[in-house]
């Protein structure tokens, strides 16, 4: 199981703990009266000590498995990428394959260590804190309790409505982190971990390939082609490219360079979420068999593919909301979730049926609860 999936499980398990703690104060929320709300709040807050320990124990138990998954996807799989690329390079150069270089293993060790440090510091350690102001799970629990009490005591909602709505609001948002990007966007646990893991693994594999090219003193490569591509990749996908910039004495002016198409930047070639790969190319030896797609059509298809990704995220989110709704006993929301899930799945089916380059990827629509 991928590190991203393990963090999704972690978040959903923690939400389950919060919901169970709330139910533990008054199992039948339908019986809770407005005048009992202040007393209910006090009883709910008293449970925070036990809830804190429960969350900490669970995170401690899961952390080694997550750390191993991160190590495997970066170091173990990255090593396989390097070995395979070296084999391909040796074949086209008619050489004996070289073992993975020290530079490559150091690169893999560095990326694995950096990734786990970022995840551990920004996610795991915060969930291990006994400080209610720093632990995101406890902050969410307190927020649900306090906002629900306020909504009831001011006459805005019934106890059941207030509790149901506040739980659902947080499930939609996800457990928070303290991270805020340049645009002011606050990262959730799931969003942050998925982005870090996806971005780092793709970057690692591409850097491993680039290092192999250096190890074999090669500067040309074939860039894979896809029917759907981002703006930066569409003009050069499927072509032979330079992996060095214009100023390098080994630069071959017959071919474009990835540096002219945003290489090294998030939105550029081989940037964040870019699925393109580089393959060895030797002039006079290698035959480029990549299919060539119209540039504008590939960009348009890329936008359509992003719509599929959006629908898939919505299916996952509604499934998470459904799980929480069923756990707390919110039957109306659970029914609404079922309807929304079917609606987005229908949109995915239609999109896939109308576009031959798309395929249905059920794993992208599922959460661990639905598997």
Swiss-Prot record:
It holds the Pfam family Phage_min_cap2. Keywords: Coiled coil, Glycoprotein, Virion. It comes from the Viruses. InterPro entries: Phage_A118_VSP1. GO terms for molecular function: structural molecule activity. It is found in: Virion. Signal peptide: none annotated. Its main location: virion. Glycans are attached at residues 124, 146. One of its GO terms (cellular component) is virion component. Residues 336-367 form a coiled coil. Belongs to the Lactobacillus delbrueckii bacteriophages ORF1 protein family. This is Structural protein.
